């Protein structure tokens, strides 16, 4: 691993998809932090998040899409209006959101969260 910032950024941009999962993590709300014993979690579609920064700060909504290529998420009701009137989802960086509710339909995800709770 290089110390040079340019090479650091380059490796982040060119990371394969299985490594980009690490780039779409967001902090957990205080009650979820206490429940699961960890500070942040990978954001999945179906999770509920609160926007902390930007024009949409204070908005809360469900994650409708996670784009690993661009390392951004799309949240329902956080949209921009194009000049032709069409509403498009506003991409958000996961560092600007807080997870307030987890989608635990995936049993493996739930088991992983519980096991990390035991080790913490």
From Swiss-Prot:
Gene coding for it: rpl24
What does the record list as GO biological process? Answer: translation
Location of region: Disordered: 1-26
InterPro entries registered for this protein in UniProt: KOW, Rib_uL2_dom2, Ribosomal_uL24_CS, Ribosomal_uL24_euk/arc, Ribosomal_uL24_KOW, Translation_prot_SH3-like_sf
Highest taxon listed in the record's lineage: Archaea
Query: One GO CC annotation, please?
Result: large ribosomal subunit
Q: Which UniProt keywords apply?
A: Ribonucleoprotein, Ribosomal protein, RNA-binding, rRNA-binding
Native source organism of the sequence: Haloarcula marismortui (strain ATCC 43049 / DSM 3752 / JCM 8966 / VKM B-1809) (Halobacterium marismortui)
Full protein name: Large ribosomal subunit protein uL24
The subunit structure is:
Part of the 50S ribosomal subunit. Interacts weakly with protein L4.
Could you tell me where the Basic residues compositional bias lies?
10-24
